[in-house]
Structures are given as C-alpha cells and as structure tokens.
Amino acid sequence: KIKWFKTMKSIAKFIAKEQMKKHLGGE
C-alpha cells in the first residue's frame, strides 16, 4: 500500500511539472 502511495506521489509530481511547463511555454 505504501509503495503504491509513493508511486502516486511521484506521478503527481511529474504531472505537476509537465503542467507547469505547458503553462509557461504555452502562454
């Protein structure tokens, strides 16, 4: 269970980074 939570956390971090990149580069 904890491993899954860690995975979700890293995935969320990755998505957030991608979103920020898109936001900064898109505008």
Curated annotation (Swiss-Prot):
Cellular localisation: Secreted
Top-level taxon: Eukaryota
GO terms of biological process kind: defense response to bacterium; killing of cells of another organism
Entry keyword set: Antibiotic, Antimicrobial, Cytolysis, Hemolysis, Neurotoxin, Secreted, Toxin
Tissues and organs where the protein is expressed, per its UniProt entry: Expressed by the venom gland.
GO MF annotations in UniProt: toxin activity
A single cellular component GO annotation: extracellular region
Annotated family: Belongs to the cationic peptide 04 (cupiennin) family. 05 subfamily.
Biological role: Forms pore that permeabilize the cell membrane. Promotes efflux of calcium from synaptosomes, causes hemolysis, and dissipates voltage gradients across muscle membrane. Potently inhibits the growth of bacteria, yeast and Leishmania. May function both in the prey capture strategy as well as protection from infectious organisms arising from prey ingestion.
Protein name in UniProt: M-lycotoxin-Hc2a
Organism: Hogna carolinensis (Carolina wolf spider)
